[in-house]
Structures are given as C-alpha cells and as structure tokens.
Amino acid sequence: MNDEAVAFSQAVQVVDPDVRAHVYSLVTALGGFNGEDADRYVLGDDALACLRDIRRWLKLYDEKYHRMDVARCLGEANLVNGDLLPIFSLWWSTGQKSKYMSRIALACLELLVPLTWPLEVHGEMTVNHHRHFPYLQHAQVSYKRGLLSRGDLNFLRTIIRIGLPSMAVPRSERTTRDDGILKLMLYLLRNIVVIAPNARLAADGDEEETSRSATINAFQAQDVFALLLTMCSNVGDDFNMQDVILLEILFHLVKGVNVQKLFMDDAQRSAKHTDELDTLLKQESSLRREYAKNAPTRHGRFGTMIWVKRDDAKVSTVSGQDVLKDSQATLQKMDESKKWNRPQPRKTHEDSVLNNDFSTPAHLNSTASRNLRMFVEEFLDSGFNPLFTHVRKALEREADRVVPINSRQFFYTVAWFLDAERARRARQQEMHLQNGKPMKELERDGFGLVASVLDQETLVFLNRSMQISFDQKDWEDLNAEMRCFTQILLTVQEMTQSLLEEDQEIAENIQNRIFYEETTHDRVLAIMREYKGQGFGYLDACTELSHVFLRMLERYSKENVDMQVRSRRRSRRKNMETQVAAPEDNNEEHASDDEDIMEAERICRERKFDFKRFAAKFCNQKCVDTFVAFTKFFRELNSDQLKRAHRYFYRIAFKQEMSVLLFRVDILNLFYTMIKGPGAMDSSKPIFKEWEELVRQVIRRMIKKIDQRPALITELLFSKMNSTLFYLEYGHERQTLPSVRRAPAELEVNPSEATTQEDKIKIVIGALVMDGQADLVAWVSNVLGTAAEERESWEAYEDAQRDEAQGAPRAPNPMIAVLPHDDACKQAMYFNAKLRLLMTLVGFERLGMEDVVGASWVVPSSQGSKDLKGIKLTIDKCLEDPYTGDIEHDPRQMLRRKYKPDDKEHNRQTTLDVDFGSESEGEDVPDGPLFPPNPRSKANAPNDSKTRRKNREAVGEREPIDEDTLEARRKARQENTRARLAKIKSELFVHASDDESDEEADKEFFDLEEKRRKEQAARVRKALLTGVVDEIGRKANKKSERKRLSNSGKSDTQSKRQRRGRTTEALDEDDDIIMDGAVARSSDHATEDDENTSATSDEDDEFDFDDNLAFRRDRDLDRDPVLPSHAEDMQPTDTRELRDNDENAPVATLARRRLRAGFVIDSDSE
C-alpha cells in the first residue's frame, strides 16, 4: 500500500521523454533570433528539412497512434509564435521572389493547418486526448492571437499571398498541388474563425484579442473578405472544389450573430443595448424585492424549524425563517423541498458542439458589426446564388469532399442569410421613410438575389432532408432544416407583399408547391408531436415553424377557396404492368379511358383541403405539451416568442373550442405564475396584457365547465384522452356506430380475354378455384341442379294443365330462391366479388335495391329447365378441369373492376365546386358555365391547380395589407374565374374526331338532314293551309311561345345576339334578306286565314302565329334561291305596307341565326 502511495505521489510523465527530445531538437534546428539583431529571425542550415520532419512526426505519430504528444510538445516549444510567424514575416519582407523561401513559407502553412485544427470531443477519445485537451485549447487560442494581432504585421495577408499564384492559374491548367495550396489557405482561415476561448478554462490574456469581433475586423483589414467574395462569386467557374470549405467559413462567421442587431445603426444599437441593460436591472431589482420580503433580520439569525399539520392529520417538518411569514409561504417551501427522482433517459453522446450550438449569441462591437454587415450585403449581391447552388448540387450527389456535417451547415447558413436579406430590406425601407420619401419612389430589387434557394430543387432537397433527419432522430440536423424552412416561408410571405408583380407571381407559385404536398403538412405536425427534451433551440425552431406554417396556410387557403392537396397515401394508382399486346376493339379502348378518368376523379375528390380539419390536428395533448414546455421559459423569451405561444393557446381555447386541453393543474399553475408570480412576467411589456386576458378567460371557462361537469375536478390531474375530451366538452360519450363493410366493387371479365358466356364462366371458376373456394362453385352447381329439377316439374305441370284446358294462357314460371347452405356461404354471397360475378353470369338476380348481407337472390322465371341444365353442365366441366392459365395468363388477372354508365356520365360532368360566396354568381352566365372544365389528367394535376395571381396596381405607400384589401383581391379573382369559366369549351363537346373528315358519313348526315327539312316544310304548308296543327307542331309552338315571351324587344334581342358567337356575324348578314321575305309572306298568310276563318279561340290564333314564327327558318331553307318574281315580297316598302294593313297581328322580332359547323343551331336545341 505504501508503494502505491509513493507511486501516486511521483510526477506523471504526460509525454514520452524520447518523443519530447526529438521534437525539441527539430524545433531548435529550425532557427532562431540572432544575438546581434534580436529582431531578425535567422533560419537554420536545413530549415526546410526540419519543417518536413516535424510535419512527418505529426502525421505518423499523433494521427497514426491517436495521440497528441507531438502537438503538446510543439505547443510547449512555442513553435508557432516563436518560429512559424517570424518566418512568415521574413518571407513577406525579403524573400517573396526567392523560390527557396516560398517553399519554406508553404511548409510553415502545412504545419499551421494541423496545429490549429479544431479540437472536437468525440467518442473515440483516449486518456491521452483528455490529458492534452485543455492545454492544446490554450495553445490554439495563443496561435490565433498571434495570427490576428502582431503589431503591424499582416499574417493573414501573407497567407493569402502564398495562395495567389495558384488562384491565378486557370482551372483547366490547375494541378493537384495548386488545389492543395488553395485548400490549405482556406482551411487555415476556417480554423482561425472556429478557435474560441474555452469558457471553462482561465483566460490567458485579453479575451477581446481572440473574440469574433477581432476576427471579423482582421478579416476586413487584411482583405480576407475580399478573397471570400471573389471565390464565392466564381465558385462555379474557377473554384468548384472549394465550395464546401467556403460554406464552413461562412457558417462559423455568422453562427449566433443576431441579424436584427447587425442591421442597426450605432444609435439604434446603443438604444437596444440600453434597453437590454434596463431589463436586466429591473429583473435584478425584482429579485431583490422578492428576497427582501423573506430576508432574515439582524436579530433572526437563529435556525427555525416548524411542524406543519396537514389535512390528513399528518405532520411535515419545514425549516427556515421564511416559513414564518404566512401559510402560503410555508406550503411553497414544502413544494420546493419535494424532489422527484425521475429516471433520466440515456443521452446520446454528441460528438461536437462546434456545429450544433445555434442558440448561443455572439456579441459584436460596433466596428465588427459594420464590417460584417458590409460583407453580408456584398455577399448577397454577388456570391449567394453561385455558392449555395453549387453546394446544394454537391450535397445531393454526395461528392467526396462532402461530410455529413455540411448539410447542417448549409441549411443554417441559408436560413441566416435569408433572414439577413429580409432585415436589409426592412432597413432600406425604414431609412427611406426617415428621409420623408414615399414608398413608390423606393427602387426595390427583386428577390432574385436569393432565388437559388427558392426553386423547386431546393424545396425537394429540404423536404427529403427533413424527413430523413426526422426518421433517424438526428435532431440537430432537423433543427437547422426547420430554421431554413421557416425562413423560406417568411421570405415567400414578404414576396407576396412586394411591389413587383413578378415577385408576387413567383411567391404564388412557391406557396402552391409547398402547400400542395400533404406530406409537408403531416411532417410539420409530426415534428410538433415528437418533442421530447431535445433542448431549447430545437423547441424554439419547431414552435416557430408550426406558427409560421399555420398562419401562412390559413391565409393561403382563404385566398384560394378551391385549394387542393396531394395525398399519396390515398391515391389509387393504376396497375401499369405490361400486358401482352392483343387487338382490342373500340369498346375496350373507351373502357380503358373511362378507367383512367374514374381514377383521376377519385384522386381529385381526396385532394380537397379543409384548413379547419388540418388545424384541429394540432389540438392534441402532445402539441399542447410542446408549447407548454416552450412557455416555461417565459422569463427568457422575447416579445415575439411570447406572442407565438399566446397565439397557439388562443387558437386552442377559442378558435378550435378545445379549452379542455388546457385544464390541467401544471398548465394552470404555469399561467397563474406568469401573471401573479412569484417571478411573474414584466407587467410593462405590451404582451403582458394579452396574456393576462387569455389566462383570465381560460380560468373563467374552467370554472363554468366544472359547474357543468364535476368530473373535470379529477381530470385536472391528468392529460386528456380523446374520449375524455369529448365527454368533458359535450357531457356524454361519443356515439360510435358499428362500422358496416360495404359490398366489394363489382367485377367483370376483361372483354379482351373472353367474349362468350362459357369462356367467362370458365375464367371466373378458375379464379375461385385458385383462391381455394371450389366449395362455393360446387354450391352454385347444386343450386342450379335443384332449380332445374323444380323448374322441370313446374313445366310438366303447366303442360298438363294446358292440355286439359285448351287455349288457356301459360302462367309464368315462379322464381326460385337461392339459399346458402351455411353462414359462411351467406357472407360470401355479399363480400366475395368473384362469387357474385359467377352468380350474375349464371343468371341469378338479386331482389330489391338494397345490397346488404342476407339479401335475397333468386333464379328468374325467364330461365327454363334446359337452360339451367346447360349452365350446370358447363360449371361441372369447369370444376372438374379448372382453368388455371399460366404465369402470363392468370385468370385472377383477367378480372377487372366494372364501372357503371352513370358513373362515367357523372365523371364527365364533374367540375370543381367553387363557392364564390356571392348571390350574384352567374349574372353574366345565367345558367352557369356553358361548359364544365376538362377532367384533370394525372400528369398535369399539380400544374392545373395553380392559380395565376392577377396583376395588382402599384400602391402609393407600402403598408401591411389589411383584411379589406385581401377581401377585395379575393373578389377580383373570383370575378376573373367566373369570366374564364364562361369561355371554357370542354372536352365533353370538343373531341379530336371533330378535325377528322369522313365523306361517306358526311353524305349520310346531309341526306338525313335534307329529308328532315322536307318533312318539316310539308307540315308547315299543311298548317298554313288548313290551320290544323299536329302534335309535333304544338310542341314546337310552345317552345317558340316561351322563346318569344322571354326575348321580346330589340334590346333583349341585342343582348342575346351578343351572347352568341361573334364569328358568325359575317355569315348571318346575307341571311337577313331571306328572313325578311319569309316573315312578310308568313304575315300575309296569317291575314288571309283570319279573313276566311270564323271566330276561333285565342289559343288557335297563337298556334297560327307560332307556326309561322317557329317554322319560318326551315321553310326558307327548303325553298330554292329567291326568284325575281318574288322580289316584290322582299322589298322593305311591301313589308311595311303589310304591317300597316294588319295592325292587330303580332309582329315577330327578327333574330340572327346561329351557325355552327355550317348548320343552323336553334336556341331550343342547346
């Protein structure tokens, strides 16, 4: 035991002495300062070999054996600050043109990169790593301090100078060595940005010298920002292999920087800091006041212990003088002393915090803020689109230079720069308004500067990455992706309010693509529900995403009442398996088309989006728990975050009427603490009033609900299940009706596989036998045999009766009931589609219209005994030798779903139900749209659902769009939709066959039309001569009478003429002359009939007139071209004289005829 104590007391050798000796000898041989000139560094005789040996030691010892001994020895020997940096200075001042010195400078750069490489905590760390880790962190901070601030020496510019020759070489001529030099230069810049003092270790020197502000100022002063801008803007042309390194540099530069503070001027930033300091002082004073209430006095420094007698006669011991104040303080002290040793789940070990800590703020001074803002603005103008487009493509194809952490960096950096772009626009607008200029004079740039992350490819990549991260529970990646998605939504929202019409249209398109996918809606909901202690950063990101997504989706669904979403889980896709080519007739082709149309119709019916139904999905206990966990940080939350939580609870309690979800003891206690304390919210904040009113209303509703449902007192202790929610809300259990299975879809045999009844029966029996249901086929055969015997007996009886009574009519055969032999057969008669098809093929019929289990099936009276025997014989043959087909001809695959004709007609007439919300709908088109829209095909369904935003007039001032403006825009879009629907010519009336020509069919058609005209002309002449009107004429007269009464007057005729096609005006001009003559002659005949006929009824007079009016067009069509002998009848003067002579005769208003495809279309034939 004494030996162990002695061994423990001895000094532990942290590094092998031999290794230390070798490394020290190499550092000494490298060079040093001359005694004569202490400021001048002198290289050793073999300095280049020493540098290469040191690099070899780092690679072969530290990296190979996973140790840090060589790095520790180099840090103790002060290699970087004592040798490498002076060598850089020597090369910069004297040896830039020397090839030897350039090689030495490059060797120093090769050493600096591994020595400054970020130290990461990972699962493979050894004891040696943990031993050297703190020291190396201190050493790297000293390296960074020497590189950033070393008097007037610009080491960063020196490093850039080393890589300039390689940058000047064109990419096609660049060698591997040039790419390596560029990579070393960028990696060193990345390392300098990443290195930061460890907060857990004592600071060595001034922390400001190595802070983020010092790094940014040094980058600005030594042209590092200019280098980054140059490479980012040309990343696709000259620096395609350096895109990922540039992304890492940008990520570590902007990580944790507050965008809003960055784009403030000095006065605003100073005021912001003053407000923050004032808030902190108020919090401190509040804590002091709380403490002063229970602080011990100078005479009360003795211990205090009291017993608290509880309601159950038990006694608890509480210590401390603060319990003497009152009973409430005593009970609170008891609650604070309670501890629940909740089992903590095993935390997943996080490899590194360099790329994870998004929430830790980075404080910048005014100079650094100004320099970084200038760089960010220039980067947005020139380098944003090239860099992020190239990086996204590299991430998608998983290039060799890409590591998994780069995806997280990509999404976070995109989110940060999108937020910066919106902040820059807001700052430009604010400065413009401060100068007193109207908004219309502000020349705003479009959002094309950030268009590379708003395209469809980026959205697809983002959605796929979010789903992968969520499935693999990679919460840090999901955190960055949620931030990116939120910033894209906010950017699109700002684009909708842009003054540029192009931005508005792009925003409309992006929203349509985002909200069209129902998987996106489900993913946002699932992220909210799956929060389980992932940290405040993740909690902030997921609550912000759900808040923004819900608000934008609600606004978009109100603006687009016909919004539809695509649900891939519900879509019924057609089986696209290749089939053997076989000749199909026209009926089969039409059946296939009908199947496609019916499939598209089913999908469209499932795409209708209901926002209330979607918002109700967020009304569950898991989502409430997520926002409750977020609200527990109310003392650290800002106004926007508090408003976010307030809006969610308001939506739950009042919009969705689900306030029961909030009736839980811990939630109510949290609300009460936020308002009444201890540690309540600051009452001077504007959001405090809104929270106070919300809490008051929630508690008031809870008290009313307790009066109605006393069981709620018990339920306050627990989370609410769905059944409990329904009972507490409505006072009774949910009435659940037993689910009734519907009858299966009706099947049929594919017409290309079988045409005769025998073949169809063979296929169906083969399918049933392959399914193991031969007993059902045997049952059908037995039923047919029994029915044949019974039918044969009845026929013999009828023959005997007819022989006895000569001439007696034959009575119809009675129907024979089809009875199942057991309950399983009874169920199969309803649920087995193949059996139902077989029963239909053999001639069985179902009685009644209701198709339910146990419905009666009968053998109809039309089937004789011979027919039944023949069918039974066919079934027996198929059952003895069932048709099984082969691999390519499976009888089960020869069956398909049967569609009813009315389904096809309904499918053709289906259109989108657009509710315009106005009683004036259809004023321009009284009977609604003339044609329904074409059915959507699967290929263009997403594109057809896009609605193009109407161009808006530029407004004078840019202000937040109010509800009245949004309502006016919605009405304008509705009017535009109505006008567009009135002009639609549907596929229902326009087919490709209209363009084809068939001379024989045309000849037959024209002959038939000529025959109809002659028959119609004969009926007209008969009616004019005899005054007798047949039934056909009367029907036409009634239609003509209604048409005459509804279209009397010149103005009505003109409006009706305007609704007709304007393309027929030229053709109709020549027909007016013929129409005038026809009217004159018909009026003359009517006058003669009135003179020669005795007094008749008014109805007969009307018939006479309506005959002339209704048939005058056909009469003129049957006549030959007008002869000169009848010219006087067509003169306007004669027509006027006839009208003057017969003043009592009604005068018909001339109407222009409508022509379509060369034929007269009467208005009644529409």
UniProtKB/Swiss-Prot annotation:
Gene Ontology BP, a term: DNA replication checkpoint signaling
UniProt-recorded Gene Ontology molecular function terms: DNA binding
Positions of the UniProt region annotated as Disordered: 333-358, 564-594, 881-981, 1023-1145
This protein's UniProt keywords: Cell cycle, DNA damage, DNA repair, DNA replication inhibitor, Meiosis, Nucleus
Record's compositionally biased regions (Acidic residues): 585-594, 916-926, 1087-1107
Protein location: Nucleus
Highest taxon of source: Eukaryota
One Gene Ontology cellular component: replication fork protection complex
Segments of skewed composition (Basic and acidic residues): 881-893, 966-981, 1109-1142
Described purpose of this protein according to its UniProt entry: Involved in chromosome segregation during meiosis and DNA damage repair.
Annotated family: Belongs to the timeless family.
Entry protein name: Topoisomerase 1-associated factor 1
Protein source organism: Aspergillus oryzae (strain ATCC 42149 / RIB 40) (Yellow koji mold)
Taxonomic lineage: Eukaryota, Fungi, Dikarya, Ascomycota, Pezizomycotina
